[in-house]
């Protein structure tokens, strides 16, 4: 098993550090994939790109993010001989971002399978163990599995500590509050 971390432009440094710490804690090799040309729609707008799809986009939206990331993950699965690509999307993601729902991944998987060499019959599939769970259920599962929640990062901002203002911080804080856990 390997973990992939996509380092796109303006990705929060604390998120990168959290990924590294979790991989180390889990004793999983992490490969950091530089994708400096990928950035959030709001940042692209600031650089002068029109980005029509970002007009009403949710916070953190990156155009075609999962098409790109999962295609790269399929490449790594191919060269390492892995049969599964595991994603961490949760129920709330599927309600916010169009490229996190199962129909999207069914279509993408079909394309990936069609792209594989005709002599390579190894199966490949996506696995999304958290896709039907909300943040509260995920935190409960994390506690049960003794996942070090303090190593995780949810903030969209690039600060030493979570901003507490972005939607991701607010959702995390609400879930922790409902479970009577101090953040």
Model regions: which residues?
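ATP-dependent adenylation/nucleotidyltransferase module used to activate substrates
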Residues: 1-146
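Local cysteine-cluster metal-coordination motifs and their immediate loop/turn environment
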Residues: 67, 71, 153-174
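Glycine-rich nucleotide phosphate-binding loop and flanking beta-alpha elements
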Residues: 93, 176-177
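Short amphipathic alpha-helical interaction/hinge segments
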Residues: 116, 177-180
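Short hydrophobic/aromatic-enriched beta-strand-loop microsegments
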Residues: 149-151
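Short cysteine/histidine-rich metal-coordination sites, predominantly Zn2+-binding motifs
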Residues: 158-159, 180-183
């Amino acid at each position: 098993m390997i973990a992939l971390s996509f380092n796109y432009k303006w990705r929060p440094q604390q998120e990168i550090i959290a990924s590294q710490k979790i991989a180390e804690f889990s004793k999983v090799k992490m490969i950091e994939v530089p994708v400096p040309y990928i950035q959030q729609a709001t940042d692209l707008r600031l650089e002068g790109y029109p980005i029509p799809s970002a007009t009403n986009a949710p916070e953190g939206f990156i155009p075609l993010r999962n098409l790109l990331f999962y295609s790269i993950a399929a490449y790594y699965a191919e060269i390492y001989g892995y049969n599964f690509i595991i994603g961490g999307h949760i129920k709330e993601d599927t309600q916010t971002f169009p490229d996190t729902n199962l129909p999207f991944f069914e279509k993408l998987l079909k394309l990936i399978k069609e792209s594989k060499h005709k002599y390579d019959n190894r199966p490949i599939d996506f696995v999304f163990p958290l896709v039907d769970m909300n943040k509260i259920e995920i935190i409960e599962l994390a506690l049960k599995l003794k996942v070090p929640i303090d190593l995780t990062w949810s903030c969209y901002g690039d600060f030493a500590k979570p901003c507490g203002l972005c939607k991701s911080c607010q959702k995390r804080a609400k879930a922790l509050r409902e479970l009577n856990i101090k953040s």
